[in-house]
Amino acid sequence: MTPDQLKLLADTEFDRAAHKKNLREAAHAQLTVPFAGGLFIASPTLIAFLGACNEDIVYIEDSYNNPVQADRVELLNLISTTYRDVVSNWYDELQKSNRIRRANNV
C-alpha cells in the first residue's frame, strides 16, 4: 500500500466509541416524556416507583423539579412503553454498528 492509501484508510477508520456515545445520547434524548403538564425521563427507577405505588393518583416531581399530579397507571404505561421502545431501538442500532468496519459503511 502506498502512504496515500494508508492515510485514506486511517481517515476512514470507524470510530466505534464515538458512534456508541452518539447512539446513547440520541436514545437518552428520546426518553423525555411530557405528561400532565410535567416532563419526565423514562427510566427503570421511575418505572419501579410507579409500579410500587398503590394510589391511583400520585404526586411526583418532574425533571424540572416541579410537583405534578398524575394518573399513576397512565403514566406508568406511557413511561414503560417509551422506555421499552427507545432502548429496543438503541439496542438494534448498536448491533448494526457492531458489524461496521469502516466509516463509509455507516
Feature-to-residue mapping (PLM):
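A preference for well-ordered globular domain cores
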Residues: 1-106
